[in-house]
Design a protein with these regions (language model features):
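Surface segments flanking catalytic/ligand-binding clefts of nucleic-acid enzymes
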Residues: 1, 131-283
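Short gly/ser-rich loop at a beta-strand->alpha-helix junction or flexible surface loop bordering the NTP-binding
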Residues: 1-150, 280-283
Length: 283
């Protein structure tokens, strides 16, 4: 069976561990050269905790550290480092006494020429996610950065990805579900949507919903599997069912192969068709 292209599973602890590991690598690299280094591209995003594995093109090595220089004459061949020229000025800041980095907005723009649209959306969704420990920027800040720097390699792909980005998502897995839904011609999914529960006279927030079709998609990550969260999810979904909504949880297995995703969306599509035809769901 064909494996799905994106390995995007992470926990907050894993994100912190990757950021710390990358920081140590950057410090070691900086101490071995007299050249001033400004870390950028995917390295900058990893320093901020992005563990999503993107589909990079062959001319980008994700196993190397990436740095940016402001002049082509400063390009060099450092060991285990890929050096890039960026002709739009370097939006540089220091994250400690030794390590200089570009802004997250610049790093996002820089990777656009090296990834596909889906990967770019995942990176943008991550950078603007709802988690206060991981959120790095907003769509408004990214748009303002675009206005300031003008054209750059990959800008068309970047603009398309930005139009598909949804701020305040909860995980890259939700991004994948949303993108796969678009590919299949299904309606627009609303992210983090409030749903009114008449029996409880309150609202609950769901990951994603086809608003007019009463079909909900939710990703059940590892943190859903402690007993309290598991019981809370069951209660929430029972209440949503009573309110006339049908919920389709996705798990790690859903993303394991393209065949699994195809089957998942066949079921989702059938539920949408059923609601449109009858105004309800069969049990």
């Amino acid at each position: 069976m064909e494996s799905y292209a994106y390995n995007t599973f992470f926990t907050l602890d894993e994100a912190r561990d990757l950021a710390q590991k990358t920081l140590e690598q950057c410090r070691a690299r900086s101490m071995r050269t007299s050249q001033e280094l400004c870390f950028s591209h995917g390295t900058r995003l990893q320093l901020a905790g992005m563990t999503a594995t993107l589909n990079y093109k062959p001319n980008y090595d994700p196993n190397k550290l990436h740095v940016t220089v402001s002049g082509a004459e400063r390009l060099s061949n450092l060991t285990e480092t890929q050096c890039h020229y960026w002709g739009h000025g370097i939006d540089q800041t220091m994250i400690d006494d030794l390590i200089a980095v570009v802004s997250v907005e610049q790093a996002l723009c820089q990777i656009a020429q090296f990834v596909d649209v889906e990967s770019m959306v995942i990176a943008l969704d991550w950078a603007t996610c709802r988690n206060e420990h991981l959120k790095q920027t907003t769509k408004d800040k990214i748009s303002l950065f675009l206005t300031d720097i003008g054209r750059f390699p990959g800008i068309r792909l970047f603009r398309k990805a930005l139009s598909l980005c949804r701020e305040n998502t909860d995980s890259p897995q939700e991004s994948i579900l949303r993108l796969e839904s678009v590919k299949r011609g299904l309606p627009e999914l609303e992210v983090n949507a409030p749903i009114y529960l008449p029996l409880q006279n309150k609202e609950v927030v769901v990951d994603m919903v086809y608003t007019n079709d009463h079909v909900i998609l939710e990703y059940d990550g590892r943190y859903h599997y402690d007993r309290n969260r598991w019981e809370g999810d069951i209660e929430k979904r029972n209440n949503l069912s009573f309110a006339g909504y049908k919920t389709f949880p996705a798990t790690r297995r859903t993303f394991a192969t393209t065949q699994n995703l195809d089957e998942y969306f066949r079921i989702v599509g059938s539920a949408i068709a059923e609601y449109r035809n009858t105004g309800s769901f069969s049990q």
